Structures are given as C-alpha cells and as structure tokens.
C-alpha cells in the first residue's frame, strides 16, 4: 500500500495485542490466524467470527468486556482466510463454505471439550451457519448457543445495500479488479482518503467515534483485492437455509441495526422464522457495524446467553 492507504493503516490503533495465546492452524495449505483469551480448560468457549473485509480485531470491544465480566470463559477469535494475519489465497479459494471449513479446523485443533457458543457478524453470520451445518456430530452436540449479528440466512444480494453487488455495474467493476489487480490497487489507493466519510454514511448510522470509523476503513483498505473478488460471488448467491434444522435446539439471539442498509431487518426476521428459539433484537438507530457502533447490544447478548447457560451442565 502507498500514500493515503498506507497512512490510513499506519496510524490506526492495533488491537488483540495482549492475547493469552495466538497461533496458526493449517487448513489445506492456508494458515489461519487465531487468538485466545481465558483458560484453555474452560467449560465454555465463545467463538467470534468477523465479517467481510474485517478481521478478528473488529471484536475488540467485545473481548474487552467479556474478559472482565467472564474471566472463566475462553474467547476464540480468528482471521478468516484472506483477512487480517491469515494467508491470502487466490480468489478461487475464497468462499463461505471454505471459510467455514477453516473455522472447523481451528475448532478441532483448539476446542476439544466443553460447550461452544458461536457468534457471527455480517459475512461471519453465514460462515457460522455453515459451521453449524457442517460440524461433525461430536462438535454439534457441544454447541450450546448462537448469536447472529447483522446477518442473513438467504442471499446477501437479495436485499439492502448488497443488492448493488448484483448489478451490471458491479460485475464490470469486479471484472476489472480480477483482470487488472495492480491497476485496482492504484485505484483503491487514490480513493483511500475518502473511505472513512463514505463508511460513516453507509455503515455507521449512530454517532460513532471517528477513531472507530477510521479503524473500519483501514481494515477494508488492508483487505487484498483477490479477497474482495473471491468472496464476491458468495456474497451474491450464498444461502444457509440448510442449517435451519440444526438451529432448532439452540437458544440465542438475532441482532440487527434499525437502519442497517447492508443486511436489513427483513434478513434478520427471516432468520427468526427459521429459528424459533432465538430472541430477535433491534438496535435503535444503528447501522450494520454493531460490534463497533452498538457494542453494548452485542455484549449484552453474549452476557445473557452465558447467564442462560450458567446453570446447564457442560458436555
């Protein structure tokens, strides 16, 4: 990255620098970075899966809260392939199903016993649903709850801002990104200084600290073009209705911002119809970036689910 893009990333604050453990898991030749807080032998592990063009760092407000509130719970975060510190494979190797496989590889390596709660934000929502659908029975039996944040169980391009991905113009843009990646980087570099104010309009609907908006913009800028292109088709067409049968036993929450333009309320209501045990909650006046924009809503959902499970025996 050069110029404005480099400056955007250089000046941003770094998070998850004080983790208890960190490492990499090999997933068919792709290294997936993971981060842990809390005891390795914890009875309950909360797994947090971030969204498209983000990274595990996007949950820093949740880890800060949960470490203080629930010191006996283990927190496991990871950078999805193509994001953060994980390897950046080719566009053809980026999809929701492959990302879910990566998560399952990390869980198989790191979480051998105890209850598991899975939280997915944005693209991490469909990825977490795919994890549930693909999980081996032994792991599925230990899943004790789930939280879907600004998520979708149907195609992301079916409604909201994501419909832009299904237009002819978007296809032309992504064809250009795929065919001329070096030119794409130059284009992205030239507009990097404009990203933050655009995000303030499109993603953040509540008044939000400028540092958090610039942090979000920097994460997007740090995402390689091949990752943007690779997940493009799945963002348009991927759906996880096949995961619905495995949701039926689980308690949990579906959270959505009242003014979310990316995954509108209708998407969360659709999840709720497939998952009758979930509590559907709307963050008043908020947009798509609830972990940063409305962190108390996300923290409260995890807190309530942990308290709900506190009296239940672990497996």
Predicted region positions:
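Catalytic histidine-centered segment of alpha/beta-hydrolase-like enzymes
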Residues: 262, 283-299
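Conserved serine/cysteine hydrolase catalytic core
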Residues: 225-273, 282
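A short loop-to-beta-strand scaffold at the N-terminal edge of the catalytic core in hydrolase folds
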Residues: 28-37
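Conserved HGGG/HGGXW glycine-rich cap/lid loop of the alpha/beta-hydrolase fold
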Residues: 36-88, 106
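Flexible "cap/lid" loop of the alpha/beta hydrolase fold
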Residues: 133, 137-183
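Conserved alpha/beta-hydrolase catalytic His-Asp/Glu region
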Residues: 181-246
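Active-site loop/oxyanion-hole signature of alpha/beta-hydrolase fold enzymes
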Residues: 30, 74-123, 133, 138-139, ...
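Active-site glycine-rich loops that stabilize anionic/oxyanionic intermediates
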Residues: 51-54, 122-123, 152
């Amino acid at each position: 990255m050069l110029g404005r893009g480099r400056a955007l990333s250089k000046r941003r604050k770094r998070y998850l620098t004080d983790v208890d453990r960190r490492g990499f898991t090999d997933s068919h030749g792709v290294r997936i970075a993971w981060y842990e807080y809390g005891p390795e032998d914890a009875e309950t592990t909360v797994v947090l899966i971030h969204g498209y063009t983000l990274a595990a760092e996007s949950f820093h407000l949740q880890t800060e809260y949960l470490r203080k509130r629930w010191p006996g719970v283990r927190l496991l975060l990871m950078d999805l392939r193509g994001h953060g510190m994980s390897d950046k494979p080719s566009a053809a190797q980026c999809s929701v199903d492959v990302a879910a496989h990566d998560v399952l590889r990390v869980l198989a390596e790191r979480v051998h016993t105890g209850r598991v709660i899975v939280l997915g934000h944005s693209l991490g929502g469909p990825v977490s649903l795919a994890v549930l659908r693909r999980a081996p029975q032994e792991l599925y039996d230990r899943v004790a709850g789930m939280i879907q944040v600004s998520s979708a169980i149907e195609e992301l391009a079916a409604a909201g801002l994501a419909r832009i991905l299904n237009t002819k113009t978007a296809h032309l843009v992504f064809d250009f990104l795929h065919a001329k990646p070096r030119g794409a980087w130059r284009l992205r570099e030239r507009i990097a200084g404009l990203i933050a104010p655009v995000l303030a309009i499109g993603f953040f609907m509540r008044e939000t600290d400028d540092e958090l908006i610039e942090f979000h913009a920097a994460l997007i800028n740090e995402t390689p073009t091949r990752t943007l292109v690779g997940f493009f088709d799945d963002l348009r067409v991927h759906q996880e209705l096949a995961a619905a049968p495995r949701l039926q036993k689980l308690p949990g929450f579906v959270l959505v911002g009242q003014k979310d333009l990316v995954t509108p309320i209708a998407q969360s209501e659709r999840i709720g119809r497939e998952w009758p045990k979930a509590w559907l909650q709307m963050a008043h006046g908020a947009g798509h970036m609830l972990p940063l924009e409305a962190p108390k809503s996300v923290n409260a959902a995890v807190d309530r689910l942990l308290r709900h499970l506190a009296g239940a025996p672990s497996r």
